[in-house]
């Protein structure tokens, strides 16, 4: 398994030497500046690749191994008028990446919003901050700030009472911050920052699309791109929904083991794989992560390793330290290592410590939400320690011992 680091480019303020010092050898990056639906050119890719892989004397090399992501446009997700054009541009971008030996591509198929949190700086018991999703605050936003048409039917009477109480206790600053947290694009998002009216309008474009319809559109997309990916040796890794349930009445189709089984059955191409994100899938108590990892091990080409802690009835959660929370990280790494040992050298599983707590000096710095340097470095070191121990001892790990 190879250790990777998500790097948002030179403007993000994280020097590549910091990546080396964290212990990573591989880079996960993307051309975020290219508009959605527009082809990535070889020249653009080479420029970014050279920036990453030009190694100063005495430094260990870094390799741009994974793209996260080539955004999938809303027209593709809705099978809209521009879908054919956008799929063509997506394929052309994939071909350009393959020509430059970048052959793992992460993407998602979540409509409108990629990942959603109500709090980007929830204070933990250590004083570090983490991202958090509060179900009642989310409902307050949906019902009383966004005022989505038909939202009431998605919430119980108890939910609606709690949401109103929260909304009525909020001042204007808190309301504005909640809007920023939920309605603005976050790292990895395929959307632009949205105003409330624009957000409502975008949601309305999915009004006639249910989960079955969205899944058909995903299958149509995969049937177009996987033959080319197979011919190029490219691995496509579908990221799970985050959180793995419906938000804003929108359909979700990559939330459970059954969802992925249906996708792989519909398009069994070798290139059709998954990004095994333990944080996203782990939010649901009914997702057995070790079982999912074992069932789909041969299709896991990229992994996001992080943990979440469910609160109350499980709909509220916060991002835990990497070895804490509700994720059996040791058991999962054991399964991934077993799979990795079966593979040829060029097919190893690439993973990154996903997200991290904002701590120490990062508390005083402007950081990309979810991606502070120190918290991710801590997470990567902890994961590396587990891998080193499992490799050295060849443990038959039993989580019940």
UniProtKB/Swiss-Prot annotation:
Cofactor(s) the record lists: Fe(2+); Mn(2+)
| The enzyme's E.C. designation | 4.2.1.8
Q: Per UniProt, which keywords does this protein have? A: Iron, Lyase, Manganese
Root EC class: lyase
One biological process term in Gene Ontology: D-glucuronate catabolic process
Signal peptide interval: none
- Pfam families, per this entry? UxuA (PF03786)
Q: Name one GO molecular function term.
A: mannonate dehydratase activity
Pathway connected to this protein: Carbohydrate metabolism; pentose and glucuronate interconversion
Q: Name the reaction it catalyses.
A: D-mannonate = 2-dehydro-3-deoxy-D-gluconate + H2O
Q: Kindly give the InterPro entries that the UniProt entry links to this protein.
A: Man_deHydtase, Xyl_isomerase-like_sf
- What is the purpose of this protein? Catalyzes the dehydration of D-mannonate.
Q: Which family does it belong to?
A: Belongs to the mannonate dehydratase family.
PANTHER family in the record: MANNONATE DEHYDRATASE (PTHR30387:SF2)
The entry's protein name is Mannonate dehydratase
